[in-house]
Design a protein with these regions (language model features):
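Eukaryotic scaffold repeat domains enriched in small/polar residues
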Residues: 1-236
Length: 236
């Protein structure tokens, strides 16, 4: 199948970054969304896109805006919005035509402080890991708010299995960013807000940051869990 990636950061020449790319399985570039090297909040721009997923009908959904998680007061949020920072979900047709967006930096339902990961379930609901607000927000495909989950920590990546289990990797919980919580992988039934399993990070003498910065997660058909880690380590 095709591979989608978010090109989050801008290069020094400002000729790359703030884009979403679609590649074939052989690496051929098929589509690019966003304006290369230019951050913004217009329909043809991204400002640090975090994740991309395709919906049941082929529509494209992008979680846009990374720095909202650092805005912890109403004053900071207002200043961030005024400066052009984003916290939104953007929807495009399968051919890349902009359809709509929803959300801004904030704490209400339908607002985000760093929407960091996306996943669809078998019912076509969109799950958004709202990392800065320590929750998962659930929407229909038109952006209407449905529900929330609060048991998964400060979430960087999510994965939903065919048997309706939710896996969420928490890379940032600590005594300063999310007191009384620890990082690791939390597992729970999709339609309930409770945890039934936990995979803690593991120690390594040679790699002191191991297990401390998990950004993405996947589960294969045999139940094996894969986690991508960065920037200070390479893999779980």
């Amino acid at each position: 199948g095709n591979v989608w990636v978010t090109d989050f950061a801008v290069n020094e020449a400002r000729t790359k970054g703030h884009q979403v790319h679609k590649f074939s399985s052989s690496g051929e570039l098929l589509m690019s969304l966003g304006t290369a090297g230019q951050a913004g909040s217009e329909p043809n721009q991204f400002n640090q896109p975090n994740d991309v997923v395709t919906g049941p009908d082929g529509s494209i959904y992008v979680a846009d805006g990374h720095n909202g998680q650092g805005m912890t007061t109403g004053q900071a949020i207002a200043a961030g919005i005024e400066a052009g920072s984003t916290g939104r979900i953007m929807k495009f047709s399968a051919d890349g035509t902009f359809i709509k967006d929803w959300g801004q930096i904030g704490t209400l339902h339908g607002e985000f402080r760093t929407p960091h990961a996306l996943a669809f379930d078998s019912e076509g609901r969109l799950f958004v890991a709202d990392r800065g607000n320590h929750r998962i927000e659930i929407f229909d495909q038109d952006g209407n708010y449905l529900d929330s989950r609060y048991s998964y920590g400060r979430i960087s990546g999510i994965f939903i299995t065919e048997d309706n289990m939710l896996y969420a990797i928490d890379s940032e919980s600590s005594g300063t960013s999310h007191p009384a919580w620890s990082n690791g992988v939390r597992i729970g039934p999709l339609n309930e807000d409770r945890i039934t399993g936990f995979i803690p990070p593991f120690d390594s003498d040679s790699r002191p940051y191991q297990g401390a910065a998990g950004e993405g997660i996947a589960v294969d058909a045999d139940g094996n869990v894969y986690a991508a880690e960065g920037p200070n380590s390479l893999s779980w």
